[in-house]
Amino acid sequence: MPGLPPDDELQDEVLLAEVRDAFGVIRVVQIGAYRFLEFGDAIEQSCVFQGDPSWLEYDYTRAMLLGALCHDAPETALFLGLGAGNLTQACLKFLPLEDVEAIELRPDVPRLAMEFLGLDDDPRLTIRIGDA
């Protein structure tokens, strides 16, 4: 099972992408086998394990899937905010979903998620830009 190493074992941070939009700076950085989507001054939005982009590194993201377990056969899902897309990836990988929609405020986020963070171009996934 992946997991972030202790702080004293972390490798140097490598900046992979940086863009500015109306809301500020968006960065993608890599530390070892992990990539992070950051908003603003190193505000970590998402963490992606490169070996499996559907792996949910943080407890709160795993907890967000609990609602899906209450439904015998979920067919659709709506995400208000895409981020790195690893929660979306996990749902597409592990749930029998036919239609998934993500609404993301910042237009560069989906492109960065696909280019650097392992978000797959899945035909079941529709990404819309807008204020959720």
Predicted feature locations:
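Rossmann-like AdoMet
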Residues: 1-74, 93, 99
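The AdoMet/dcAdoMet-binding core of the Class I SAM-like
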Residues: 51-132
